[in-house]
Amino acid sequence: MARKSEIVKAAVGIDYSKFEEPGGRFDYERMMREAVPHSLEEIVKIQSGMSVGDTKLLSLDNVTELARRTAGGGKGAQILVKDEAQNLSGSFKARRAALSVYEAHRMGYKGVVAATSGNYGAAVACMAARLGLKCIVVQECYDSRRVGQPEILEKQRACEAMGAEVVQLTVGPELFYETLMLLEDTGFYNASLYTPSAIAGIETLGWEIAQQCRSQLGRDPDVVVATNAGGGNITGTARGLRKAGAKSQVYAASVDLSGLHMASDHDFNRKSFTTGHTGFGVPFTVQPDRTDVPRNAARPLRYMDRYLLVKEGEVFYMTEALAALEGMERGPAGNTSLAAAFALSMTLPSDQVIVVQETEYTGAGKHPMAQLSFARRNGVEVLIGDPETEVPGKNIVLPDHPSRFKVRE
């Protein structure tokens, strides 16, 4: 760990020290300009060449109608969703992976290493396969009983299917240590979630939202809702919106897992989401430089206008509603922002527009039934009622009526 700075410098090709300033500050905008040698237009071209981006912006007419009927009184903002599941690896993470892996290839690295238990690993494996690079994905997967979460095991399957080597670890601090060891031993590129390239790759998402809203609706969205964990999603999306000249409000959304500790062996398998929750969202929002690079390019507090919280049960409910009402079966974690948008819609006038900026693919381990069954096996009750009574790690409360959805901050 004492050699972290030199290992990371060799593994990403960035000298972070030149962006430091007196008093513990650093020049964020200079870092983003100089560490990403591509314009937004060039990034769009790079991603397009890797079958990433230009995903559809879909109007959720039936979900919107449900919000309007439930709210009444002229409330119920129109809800649209950016169907990022259309990307080659099945999520918006393909955008950040495409640019990161492209940079690794451009700089002559023979392979890439990514520390992630989520969709990013599959995205890096996918892009590495397209560019002929080796890939190692490091997952925090098991508790001390060697019991792994179904969602993470699903990602193992996806990564290995695309030729990646998957290193699986138990919960705890060894993830970053093992990643540093692998970077040093292999000389591979650190395809971190938090490099400037990884964040710049998401800017195309915000830019597309603005362009597509103008084309389809003749206006910018009033609100864009982004699921928040490490902060890259909202940072990149907001930067892209700004580059498109949009003045939309940008809201973060996370699943409320208050009381659970993400490094706790006991708590690890008592949560249903590996990302997009407060266990990552809150710490990385207030202290972003707790990552595998010296300075995190994801700075959510610079860009979020509000931080909304949803309950686990609400996300599962909305996942089922999206499939039943719109014919879109998508992964639960990607519907965190949709659950927040549904609650928000019922508080806004019907002439306003909310864009949910992602969906993700679903699979056997990511499906709600797999996750709810796993929760029950780990002592978590699955109930139907008022989500306000939900206690993370003890129960999951599915709403008994759509009016139960609430805006929380």
Q: Language-model features: where?
A:
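Acidic-glycine-rich active-site phosphate/pyrophosphate-binding loop
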Residues: L58-I79, S91-R95, L99, Y177-E184, ...
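Active-site/ligand-binding loops adjacent to catalytic centers
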Residues: D54, F176-E184, K243-E329, Q371-E409
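Positively charged, low-complexity intrinsically disordered leader regions
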Residues: I7-K110
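Claisen-condensing/thiolase-fold acyl-transfer catalytic domains that form or cleave C-C bonds
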Residues: N228-R239, K243, E312-L383
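Small/polar-residue-rich loop-to-helix segments that shape phosphate-bearing ligand pockets
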Residues: I136-D220, D256, M262-L309
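A short, small-residue-rich loop immediately preceding and capping a beta-strand
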Residues: A104-M127, L131-C141, D220-G236, A333, ...
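Active-site nucleophile and cofactor-binding loops and adjacent substrate-binding regions
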Residues: A85-A94, G111-Y120, Y194-I199, V224-G230, ...
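Buried hydrophobic positions in well-ordered alpha/beta secondary-structure cores of metabolic enzymes
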Residues: K56, V81, K93, G118, ...
